[in-house]
């Protein structure tokens, strides 16, 4: 389904609103997203579980093993999202497939998304100046700071400052402030080609993120975003996003801050399943008196 068609259907769809006005979660989350019609999901919900056309497993909406819609959800009614960057999702082997939102990305942007199950991890050493890992932590930086730094670095292969002694690039936007002031902010940054996302519960991530094959890559954190995932882990900050939320917000930030284009809902359909499931769960909680 084309983006133009999906925008024409936005009046029939669920929608979202900005997360930052302090309103209730439901009001925040059900306004303004330009989504394709979710009628197909509403019909499928009423029918109940259906077979996967590949493995014949009984599933609701989609098969999280085969990454395809179930028989009651016609593929033609599922939006297709084209991304400006390739995405690798590295999934922990103990992550419950049915609880992961990584499958949403593969279903909706299948040409640009590859899912690996750890310890199957590609080699990124020869691509380290073209790849970032979206992962929060003390050494993480914002997307804007990272790409501005690269813009000012010239020939990355010859830039000794970009060869870290501890295998991960170290830099400080504050220390490079004078350099930043000379950057042509109208010039798009085109050398970032791939983004890695870790799909795992937070207590399972340490071994994965420490894997030698992921060393030497800059960690980027989406510091201004808050999660609305219904399975958010207790004890973790609300800025720790679900996988599909992280992908969505990264793409929006890349589009507006790096490509410097007006955002017109190009990636909103990444939340096609997420938004619908959020609404179902919130409605159920309301009915049970838990909201």
From Swiss-Prot:
Q: What is its main location?
A: nucleus
List the Pfam families.
Answer: DTW
Q: Which cysteines are joined by disulfide bonds?
A: none
Family annotation (SMART domains)? DTW (SM01144)
Record key words, sorted? Nucleus, S-adenosyl-L-methionine, Transferase, tRNA processing
Q: Where in or outside the cell?
A: Nucleus
- Tell me the enzyme class: transferase
| GO biological process terms, semicolon-separated | tRNA modification
> Where along the chain is composition biased (Basic and acidic residues)?
171-181
Give start-end ranges for motif DXTW: 199-202
Q: What is its EC number?
A: 2.5.1.25
Q: Which reaction does it catalyse?
A: a uridine in tRNA + S-adenosyl-L-methionine = a 3-[(3S)-3-amino-3-carboxypropyl]uridine in tRNA + S-methyl-5'-thioadenosine + H(+)
Region named Disordered: 158-181
Cellular component annotations (GO), alphabetically ordered: nucleus
Signal sequence coordinates: none
Write out the transmembrane intervals.
none
Q: Does the keyword tRNA processing apply?
A: yes
Q: Which family does it belong to?
A: Belongs to the TDD superfamily. DTWD1 family.
- Spell out the PANTHER family in the cross-references: NATURAL KILLER CELL-SPECIFIC ANTIGEN KLIP1, TRNA-URIDINE AMINOCARBOXYPROPYLTRANSFERASE 1
Q: What does the UniProt function comment say about this protein?
A: Catalyzes the formation of 3-(3-amino-3-carboxypropyl)uridine (acp3U) at position 20 in the D-loop of several cytoplasmic tRNAs (acp3U(20)).
User: Protein name, please?
Assistant: tRNA-uridine aminocarboxypropyltransferase 1
Q: Which organism is it from?
A: Xenopus laevis
């Amino acid at each position: 389904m084309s983006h133009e068609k999906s925008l024409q259907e936005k009046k029939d769809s669920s929608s979202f609103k900005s997360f930052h006005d302090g309103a209730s979660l439901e009001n925040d989350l059900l306004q303004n997203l330009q989504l394709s019609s979710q009628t197909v999901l509403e019909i499928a919900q009423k029918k109940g579980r259906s077979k996967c056309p590949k493995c014949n497993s009984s599933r609701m909406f989609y098969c999280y093993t085969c990454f395809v819609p179930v028989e009651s959800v016609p593929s033609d009614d599922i939006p297709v999202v084209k991304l400006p960057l390739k995405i690798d999702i590295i999934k922990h082997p103990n992550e419950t497939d049915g609880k992961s939102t990584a499958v949403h990305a593969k279903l909706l942007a299948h040409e640009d998304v590859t899912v690996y199950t750890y310890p199957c991890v590609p080699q990124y050493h020869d691509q380290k100046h073209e790849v970032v890992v979206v992962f929060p932590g003390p050494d993480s930086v914002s997307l804007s700071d990272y790409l501005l730094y690269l813009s000012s670095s010239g020939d990355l292969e010859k830039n000794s400052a970009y060869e870290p002694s501890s295998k991960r690039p170290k830099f400080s936007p504050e220390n490079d402030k004078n350099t930043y002031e000379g950057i042509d902010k109208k010039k798009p940054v085109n050398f970032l080609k791939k983004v890695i996302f870790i799909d795992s519960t937070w207590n399972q991530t340490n071994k994965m993120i420490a894997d030698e094959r992921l060393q030497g890559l800059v960690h980027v954190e989406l510091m201004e975003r808050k999660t609305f995932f219904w399975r958010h882990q207790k004890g973790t900050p609300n800025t720790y996003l679900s996988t599909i939320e992280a992908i969505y917000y990264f793409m929006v930030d890349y589009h507006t801050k790096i490509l410097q284009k007006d955002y017109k809902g190009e990636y909103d359909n990444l939340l096609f399943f997420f938004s619908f499931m959020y609404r179902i769960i919130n409605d159920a909680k309301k009915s049970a008196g838990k909201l």
